[in-house]
Amino acid sequence: DPNVAFYSVVAVICWQYIPFYMIFFIAALSNIPQELYEAAKIDGATQGQYFWRIELPLLTPSIKTACILSLIGSLKYFDLIYVMTEGGPSNATELMATYMYKNAFASFKMGYGSTIASAMFLIITTAGIFAYFVTRRKEE
């Protein structure tokens, strides 16, 4: 079933990367100075205000970095999907990387596979540069 294949791959990828992002965000949270929480407590802030006015603004660079890592990682993901489904039933889990591999090495269309790999390189590089310019800090 294509739906089962897709959701099983998503579940395994989440299982693989959630610990990384948990440690990433725990490290970012531990870098928030305790003085900010103490000052907010003295000012009478609620738990919601702690999150919206202290934590979220200070976690924004970490959130942006995590989004960039997720975006670029998802564009070049290959090994797990190929091992689990080889592109899946009815191409349900087909990615550019698995499509490139099938054309270049299974069908021996090296030129076409090379073209797909070049397109992947351009897309990933463009996405990375775009994400860099969107998320960089504005210097004042």
From Swiss-Prot:
Pfam families: BPD_transp_1. It is found in: Cell membrane. The chain crosses the membrane at residues 9-29, 65-85, 115-135. GO terms for cellular component: plasma membrane. It is a multi-pass membrane protein. May play a role in sugar transport. This is Putative ABC transporter permease protein ORF1. It comes from Caldicellulosiruptor sp. (strain Rt8B.4).
